[in-house]
């Protein structure tokens, strides 16, 4: 306390532990903070200010060294004032009445400015908050971060140049629910209330495929050891995308035909978007649980895809990862991707555009409200650019899929749902 008394400057508040009770340096009562350059209670603060303003002169009736406590601080004003000076209280810190008034006005003005800024700051409406909550719930219900279902796919087989490797789970079975083998016909309401949708739900849509150039190289079956497993993975992912899409606010208002068109045209794009959650920039791989389900570029090539697709896909995944999207932004981007009015074959483009506009406005408002700078700078524009990148990836995927599916020995390894969504079923 003596060291504090010798100081003529404001002590650093960081030097004091907030958890330690603060004591008035004059009387030992509970202190309320630094007043006039010393830690004091409200009583001694007021006493010092009044004494300095009145230029009061006090005389001690005793020896001039009274011990000042909370109980007797009113008994000897001279020793109390002396104690105030001893601990470092300075009259230069006392504001005049005019200065006090100006300070109060400044504080009031600052509060008013903050209130005005707060009122002008964009806020998510109740409807927008509801949209985000629904999409988050839809994503959580249709995306399993533990990837526990992967063991039910046909097992991954990684054949090396020097010889074959055995599947990690020889007895793993290919579950019908993942392969889309259902033979039931499409109902009037194509998007049903169930979480899963079988491949026949798309059967009413007459697909028009462009004539594809004959593949220049016939793929060897030994080079496609990962095709069965990844076909099951994609089939499973398509079902999850369908489940997510059904919960997008406004999606069920569309006709069954438009729902099918949107799902077929966006499925691979949304799968690529979703896969970013498992993408790791350290080794440019997708890690879905244990090492059996860690997918590298070599695994994708063993499913029949070339670097013309894989290289831009990796670039896309890295760029998307670097945006550090919030989960709310991620689910909104997926929904916007699905509900795109410019997909070929849609009938009610105006209604689809209205739904997408509502989602886009929600995303822009969320970024302004909840995504702090510098990450929010041009974030919406960057996210829309990612959708454009996905269109290019989709186009390249379609080319490579057609090359693959025109080979009967390859198409046999695909699931009915994959065949139905990505192109005409090969007979």
UniProtKB/Swiss-Prot annotation:
Bias class Low complexity marks the residues at 177-190
Tell me where in or outside the cell this protein is found.
Nucleus; Cytoplasm
Q: Which residue intervals make up region (Hinge)?
A: 97-126
Q: What is the effect of changing residue 346 to M?
A: In VDDR2A; decreased calcitriol receptor activity; decreased affinity for calcitriol; decreased ligand-independent localization to the nucleus; loss of interaction with RXRA; decreased interaction with NCOR1; decreased interaction with NCOA1; decreased sequence-specific DNA-binding
Tagged with keyword Hydrolase = no
Is Zinc included in the keywords of this UniProt record?
yes
Q: Which regions of the protein are recorded as binding DNA?
A: 21-96
- Report NR C4-type zinc finger ranges: 24-44, 60-84
Entry PTM: Ubiquitinated by UBR5, leading to its degradation: UBR5 specifically recognizes and binds ligand-bound VDR when it is not associated with coactivators (NCOAs). In presence of NCOAs, the UBR5-degron is not accessible, preventing its ubiquitination and degradation.
Annotated calcitriol binding sites: 143, 237, 274, 278, 305, 397
Provide the binding site for Zn(2+) 2: 60, 66, 76, 79
Amino acids binding Zn(2+) 1: 24, 27, 41, 44
Among Gene3D superfamilies, the record links this protein to: Erythroid Transcription Factor GATA-1, subunit A (3.30.50.10), Retinoid X Receptor (1.10.565.10)
What role does it play? Nuclear receptor for calcitriol, the active form of vitamin D3 which mediates the action of this vitamin on cells. Enters the nucleus upon vitamin D3 binding where it forms heterodimers with the retinoid X receptor/RXR. The VDR-RXR heterodimers bind to specific response elements on DNA and activate the transcription of vitamin D3-responsive target genes. Plays a central role in calcium homeostasis. Also functions as a receptor for the secondary bile acid lithocholic acid (LCA) and its metabolites.
Similarity-based family: Belongs to the nuclear hormone receptor family. NR1 subfamily.
What is the official name of this protein in its record?
Vitamin D3 receptor
Q: Which organism is it from?
A: Homo sapiens (Human)
């Amino acid at each position: 306390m003596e060291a504090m008394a010798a100081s003529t400057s404001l002590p650093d508040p960081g030097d004091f532990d907030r958890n330690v009770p603060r004591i008035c340096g004059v009387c030992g009562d509970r202190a309320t903070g630094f007043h006039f350059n010393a830690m004091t209670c409200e009583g001694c603060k007021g006493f010092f200010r009044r004494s300095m303003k009145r230029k009061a002169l006090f005389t001690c009736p005793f020896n001039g060294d009274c011990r000042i406590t909370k109980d007797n601080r009113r008994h000897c004003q001279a020793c109390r004032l002396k104690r105030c000076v001893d601990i470092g209280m300075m009259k230069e810190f006392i504001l005049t009445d005019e200065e006090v008034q100006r300070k109060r006005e400044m504080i009031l003005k600052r509060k008013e400015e903050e209130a005005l800024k707060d009122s002008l700051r964009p806020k998510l409406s109740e409807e927008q908050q509801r949209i985000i909550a629904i999409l988050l719930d839809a994503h959580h219900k249709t995306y399993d971060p533990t990837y526990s279902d992967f063991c039910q796919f046909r097992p991954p087989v990684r054949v090396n140049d020097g010889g074959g490797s055995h599947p990690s789970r020889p007895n793993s079975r290919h579950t019908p629910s993942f392969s889309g083998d259902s033979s039931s016909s499409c109902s009037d309401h194509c998007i049903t209330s169930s979480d899963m949708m079988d491949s026949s739900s798309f059967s009413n849509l007459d697909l028009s495929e462009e004539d594809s150039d004959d593949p220049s190289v016939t793929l060897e079956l030994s080079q496609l050891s990962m095709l069965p497993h990844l076909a099951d993975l994609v089939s499973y992912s398509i079902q999850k995308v369908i489940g997510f899409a059904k919960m997008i606010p406004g999606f069920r208002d569309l006709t069954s035909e438009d729902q099918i068109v949107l799902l077929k045209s966006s499925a691979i794009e949304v799968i690529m978007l979703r896969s970013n959650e498992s993408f790791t920039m350290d080794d440019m791989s997708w890690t879905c649980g244990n090492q059996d389900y860690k997918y590298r570029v070599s695994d994708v090539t063993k499913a029949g895809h070339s670097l013309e697709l894989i290289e831009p896909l990796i670039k896309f995944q890295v760029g998307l990862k670097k945006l550090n999207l919030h989960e709310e932004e991620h689910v909104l981007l997926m929904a916007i991707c699905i509900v795109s009015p410019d997909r070929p074959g849609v009938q009610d483009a105006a209604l689809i555009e209205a739904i997408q506009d509502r989602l886009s406005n929600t995303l822009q408002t969320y970024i302004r409200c909840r995504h702090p700078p510098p990450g929010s700078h041009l974030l919406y524009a960057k996210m829309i650019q990612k959708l454009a990148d996905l269109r290019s990836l989709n186009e390249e995927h379609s080319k490579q899929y057609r090359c693959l599916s025109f080979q009967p020995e390859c198409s046999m390894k695909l699931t009915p749902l994959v065949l139905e969504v990505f192109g005409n079923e090969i007979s």
